[in-house]
């Protein structure tokens, strides 16, 4: 009899449930726990294989009749902003994104709550408490960080810190080959800033500066309005049966 090493992940399959993206479809997920000394290495490998992370769980769609969820990653080194993206970048030049350890705060939760109530009132995360939020941020064994976006202050040039109100937050995993945007949220009262687009652009610039080739955006679902924004950031790669394939839009 052979024995698996203690650090080898075990995979499980969820029961069918209604798909949050395509009406009338059922979703199932295969998942594993990211724990132990190898959690960071396993998370890297699984993300490169189409998994996403939520707390200490890595999961991937395993639907019986649908293959609509496609993993997407931006080729950071080749990316060029469109005219509209340059406008968004310029419009947010008064913001500073500062990296912090993955620790929750009451200020973050207030913004998170405001975002959910305005944008995802009927979503699966709508009833998350402050303790649920804290677990989303802290319950991890992988290399992750919080990026807080604030307005620049009078001393920002010297300190590289923003001292204004918290406007946007990104929870981001740092991997061997890129940055993975786990979750992000922003003030719903500043639609003119296109903060979701801005944070993706900022992550592309951060990946470039760190010499990392990819920014992982999670899943794109053709036909889902919620997901359409992801294919605007080209060139990118989509994960299919033959591995990662280039996509130009």
From Swiss-Prot:
The keyword Protein transport does not apply. One of its GO terms (cellular component) is cytoplasm. It comes from the Bacteria. The keyword Cytoplasm applies. Its EC number is 2.3.2.29. It is an enzyme of class 2 (transferase). One of its GO terms (molecular function) is leucyl-tRNA--protein transferase activity. Keywords: Acyltransferase, Cytoplasm, Transferase. Belongs to the R-transferase family. Bpt subfamily. This is Aspartate/glutamate leucyltransferase.
């Amino acid at each position: 009899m052979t024995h698996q090493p203690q650090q080898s992940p075990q995979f499980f399959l969820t029961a069918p449930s209604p798909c949050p993206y395509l009406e009338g479809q059922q979703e199932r997920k295969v998942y594993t726990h990211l724990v132990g000394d190898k959690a960071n290495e396993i998370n890297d490998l699984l993300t490169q294989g189409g998994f996403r992370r939520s707390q200490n769980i890595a999961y991937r769609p395993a639907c019986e009749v649908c293959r609509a969820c496609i993993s997407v990653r931006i080729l950071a080194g080749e990316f060029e902003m469109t005219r509209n993206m340059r406008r968004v970048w310029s419009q947010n030049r008064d913001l500073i994104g500062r990296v912090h350890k993955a620790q929750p705060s009451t200020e973050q939760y207030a913004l998170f709550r405001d975002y959910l109530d305005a944008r995802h009132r009927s979503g699966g995360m709508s009833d998350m408490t402050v303790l649920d939020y804290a677990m989303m941020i802290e319950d991890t064994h992988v290399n992750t960080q919080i990026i807080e976006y604030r307005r620049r202050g009078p001393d920002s040039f010297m300190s590289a810190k923003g001292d204004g109100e918290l406007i946007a937050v990104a929870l981001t995993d740092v991997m061997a080959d890129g940055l993975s945007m786990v979750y992000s949220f922003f003030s719903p009262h500043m639609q003119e800033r296109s903060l979701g687009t801005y944070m993706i652009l900022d992550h592309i610039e951060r990946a470039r500066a760190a010499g990392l080739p990819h920014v992982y955006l999670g899943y794109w679902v053709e036909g889902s309005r919620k997901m359409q924004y992801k294919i605007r950031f080209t060139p990118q790669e989509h994960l299919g049966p033959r591995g990662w394939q280039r996509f130009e839009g």
